[in-house]
Amino acid sequence: MEDFTPWQLKMFQKTLKKKLRLKALKKHLRNLSSSDCCLLITCGDNNGAINFFLNELGGKWSWADFEDKSIQEMSEFLGKEVHQVSEDNLPFPDNEFEYVISVDVHEHLEDPNPFTRELWRVAKPGGKVIVTVPNGDETKIATRIKNSIGMTKEKYGHVREGYDIPELKEVLKANNIEPCAESSFSQFFTEMLELTINFLYVNILSKKSKAKVEKGTIAPATQDQLKSVEKTYRMYSLVYPMFWLISKLDCIFFNSVGHAVMVEGKKG
């Protein structure tokens, strides 16, 4: 029987870190109601799969992304417009959303404040702003390994490694968003597996791709990019169960802050 599952969802099922991010977001959205207006903003490393799964939780969702490379495919997949946005101009009214979620945007910005002020502006009074970024702690072993093999922040399209939880809280507080919850995910083993995948794509596969691959792209983001690495992706699909099992060793670091952090704040 032919499988009609969208390629975005098939690809998501073979991810590690993206699944952990969705799991963490679900915990922060546990009080979401069907009438809540919600906004998700991403920054290029998104094919729409996480949007799909968040939409399944309920609420009335709007979508936005900073880059245009996959917006058309995302809009077609989701059946709803994905807005292209800039850091100081979100095309939404003031006080519009009960939940505003930013996924891995701040580390791309020289100055995080204009964008964070926009998150504050479009959130309703008392609404929640949830921000996730890479952990900016450069002393973490996995981060040191990344930098030592040339997978620096620039390869990911970042202007900084990220933010640790106290730094991210300060950014939110500076823009009148009061932090009220925090979490983290992705420990050493998941990071090393992700690094292996990203290193292979950035340094080898993307250079052979027939589809255009923009600087800062660490994994296929469009169907054409995925088709260009189809044979390698099939091989990865075969070893994915082993990767998944290895990633479970992250439990060894249950007391450590993960390599991705999330802070939830409330608009006063």
Task: Report the location of each language-model feature.
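Conserved N-terminal segment of class I S-adenosyl-L-methionine
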Residues: M1-P93, Y99-I101, M242-L245, F254-M262
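S-adenosyl-L-methionine-dependent methyltransferase catalytic module, highlighting the catalytic core
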Residues: D3, Q8-L16, N113-P114, E118, ...
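Surface-exposed alpha-helical interface segments used for non-catalytic interactions
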Residues: K23, Q72, E98, N113-R117, ...
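GHKL-family ATP-binding catalytic core of two-component histidine kinases
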Residues: P91-P93, E110, D164
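A short SAM/SAH-binding and catalytic strip from SAM-dependent methyltransferases
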Residues: Y99-E110
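Helix-to-beta-strand junctions that scaffold the AdoMet/dcAdoMet cofactor pocket
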Residues: L109-E110, A123-P125
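C-terminal beta-strand of the catalytic ATP-binding
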Residues: G265-G268
